[in-house]
Each structure stands twice: as structure tokens, then as C-alpha cells.
Regions:
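Small-residue-enriched flexible segments
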Residues: 1-105, 112-140
Length: 140
């Protein structure tokens, strides 16, 4: 049980499915009686699905391309990135690559122990507020 730590939990996330969307419910610790504590609410009897993390860079590139398209030139993004994602990046050796990409996108922020999105507490995500110049009149 000693080897079950944050790095193992980050590499093997669990998620709850709500309306065709999956929301990660990160394990915080395993207790001596083998019960689990999570970083956010998990109701008794809820069905959790084992997830497989994918590469973060293509996902972040797609996210920022979409933001540019919708908002125009990004001036600053205030980012909240779950610390479990950081552990994942450290373990797979891509921390510098992702850090460089986020710097190029003018992201400033910090690592968190959970994020709020659409009124829901979630884990192992990147959330933020993007500030842009805006699009020319007539663009959506």
C-alpha cells in the first residue's frame, strides 16, 4: 500500500460520467481499511470509470487555437492547473515542453488541488480565464 501515492493516482485517474461528459475524481489517499478519500465529492454508490491519460500538448494546442479563433489575440490567460497534471508531466518528461508552450501562450498561474468549472469541483484539469483584444466587428 505504501507505493500507492499521488503519482500512481495521477497516472490512473478515475472519472464520473455526467450527461455524456467525464469528470475526473482524483484519489487523495488509500486508508488502512482500503477505503479511498478523493479530492472532490464522490457519493456512495457512484460509478467510476478508469481513464487513461493522453498526451497533453495536442489537447492544449487545440484549446488555445479555439480560444484564438473565438476571442482574437490572447493578451493573457490566468491558468489554474491541477498539481496531479504536474506530477504526470514530471513523470513523462514533458514538463519543460508544456511549460514552454504555456509561456508562448502568455499563461500565468499556479498549480491547484482542484478546479471549478460550470459550478462543479473537478480534478486533473487546466482551467482559466483568457483575456483577449477582441475580434473585429462582424466576427463571431
Amino acid at each position: 500500500m505504501a507505493q500507492l501515492d499521488h503519482r500512481v493516482f495521477a497516472a490512473h485517474p478515475l472519472a464520473v460520467r455526467i450527461n455524456q461528459q467525464y469528470y475526473v475524481r482524483a484519489i487523495q489517499q488509500v486508508h488502512p481499511d482500503l477505503s479511498l478519500s478523493f479530492y472532490c465529492a464522490v457519493e456512495n454508490g457512484i460509478v467510476l470509470t478508469a481513464m487513461t491519460p493522453g498526451p497533453m500538448l495536442p489537447n492544449l494546442q487545440s484549446l488555445f487555437e479555439g480560444l484564438q479563433e473565438r476571442l482574437g489575440d490572447l493578451l493573457l490567460t490566468i491558468g489554474c492547473d491541477c498539481f496531479l497534471r504536474r506530477l504526470e508531466l514530471e513523470d513523462d518528461g514533458s514538463l519543460d515542453q508544456i511549460g514552454g508552450f504555456l509561456r508562448e501562450q502568455r499563461v500565468m498561474g499556479f498549480n491547484t488541488y482542484g478546479e471549478q468549472f460550470n459550478g462543479m469541483h473537478i480534478n486533473q484539469t487546466f482551467t482559466g480565464v483568457a483575456i483577449a483584444r477582441g475580434r473585429a466587428p462582424g466576427h463571431r
